[in-house]
Amino acid sequence: MLGTWVLMLMVPSLSVAAERYALIVTGANGEASYAAQYEQWRQTAVTTLVDRLKFDPARVQTLFDGGDAEHTSNAAGVRRAVDAVRARMTADDLLLVLLIGHGSFDGTEAKFNLVGPDLSAAEWAALLKPLRGKVVLVNTTAASFPFLEHVSGPRRIVITATDSIAQRFDTVFPEYFIKALADPSADIDKNGRVSIWEAFLSASMGVRRYYTQRGQLATERSLLDDNGDGQGREAGGEGTDGSAASRTYLAPDVPGAPDTDDELLALLQKRAALQIDADDLKDRRQLMTPDEYAKEFERLMIELAKVSREIRKKQKT
């Protein structure tokens, strides 16, 4: 399929609309149980992009452990796939890179585990740097945090499943991120499309619920960087990241859809952050005195009520 994909990329397009590309890589499987899970996530991602978000199937490339010579998730396959996009990509185009599998950190470098030699965060950054269009890199693996620093830059949105090199356990972030891409409930501003920020927010909240429902401490905290400083921001945290991601969509334009209301979007994001804070407070309840918990709970509920009231006012205008 890669050969056909490369030929297609060499033919000039008659369309002036921005093109959307995707590269989905599931790395070295390891145990058989991982192979089944990674295949499920990969297939779900492809189905979501093609059937729900209307990507051209010829522009969705997959690499995986056990694939044929053109689809094996090794370093050579990754380089071929990125080179194929680079040959065609314009400044108006978008590429989604979704990494699913195992990640590692050896004390010096963070790597995404491939079949054969791995590629480090720095090597991924070098591969993607020549691309002229917008790149959304989502590394859903453990120890993915260093990718934030290396890949971030102008016209780059980087999401990592972890916020520390110490987070080396298997992640559930891909389950919730892939689901959020076309989930109407993730569309918090109700404009008919799920932005990258909204998918990140929905996935982050899903991960928190996963651990809370099991009575476990979360071993992963996702970050998003879209301002190029390599610092990143949690879904419920403070920071300047999120503006570009809030205006970046994988879905095609929706005819007649309202423009993004910056003030409403800020309020919606604030409400989501407060809801995350409320969930965190419940997790910490056993570590607090009853008075401390009651006081903090009351403060959050008052803030939530104020923000919700402002949202209703904006939605009526």
Language model region names:
Residues 28-36, 64-72, 85, 109-115, ...:
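Second-shell loop/turn segments in exported
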Residues 25-29, 63-67, 98-102, 115-116, ...:
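Active-site-proximal beta-strand/loop segments in catalytic clefts of secreted hydrolases
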